[in-house]
């Protein structure tokens, strides 16, 4: 990136190299500059894709790198294999001057986070926003507005960011019904 080369080591044997250090992939999230974080996440994403697609899922033949674009190709059956990118949403749910923040249940990540989740087959991103908010905190939303997106290579995702308003009925108390399997607080 720019004039800096980044490398990923996949082996178990760590080589001592002056000026270099080994870091857990998930701990790179807090690193700076953010271009280095993007490089690490993208490298991780591609490494996982290469490792899990060494053989064709249709016929079992060893795959080869395509010379024209980022894909693998099966020389036997001709199947084309592209990197897997799972669409997901991350949602800022606003209620007046408040925003819903959660902490995940049963995960290593313990900081506050916005509601997030994967888009299912046949579902638009906006439908995902509605479903995820309803599943995780039990409220309806309105005025869903796209904000921006970012690659999230740690989990092979493309995160699409949205803001929306909590749709609390007149006289409703706005009580949240938390899915304790997903959300701790």
Show which residues each predicted segment covers.
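A gly/proline- and charged-residue-enriched helix-loop-helix capping module
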Residues: 15-58
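Glycine-rich, flexible loop/turn motifs
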Residues: 45, 70, 115, 174, ...
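A generic structural signal for well-ordered coil/turn residues at beta-strand boundaries
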Residues: 52, 87, 95-96, 108, ...
């Amino acid at each position: 990136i720019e004039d800096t080369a980044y490398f990923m080591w996949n082996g178990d044997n760590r080589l001592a190299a002056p000026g270099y250090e080994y870091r857990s992939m998930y701990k790179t999230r807090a690193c700076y500059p953010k271009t280095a974080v993007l490089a690490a996440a993208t490298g991780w994403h591609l490494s996982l894709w290469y490792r899990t697609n060494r053989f064709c899922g249709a016929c079992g033949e060893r795959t080869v790198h395509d010379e024209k674009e980022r894909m693998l190709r099966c020389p036997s059956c001709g199947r084309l294999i592209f990197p897997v990118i799972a669409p997901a949403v991350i949602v800022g749910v606003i209620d007046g001057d408040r925003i819903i923040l959660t902490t995940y249940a049963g995960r290593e990540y313990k900081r506050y986070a916005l509601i997030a989740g994967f888009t299912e087959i046949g579902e638009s991103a906006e439908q995902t926003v509605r479903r995820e908010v309803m599943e995780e905190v039990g409220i309806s939303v309105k005025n869903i507005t796209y904000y921006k997106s970012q690659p999230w290579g740690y989990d092979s995702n493309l995160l699409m960011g949205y803001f929306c308003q909590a749709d609390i009925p007149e006289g409703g108390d706005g009580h949240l019904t938390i899915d304790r399997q997903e959300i701790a607080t």
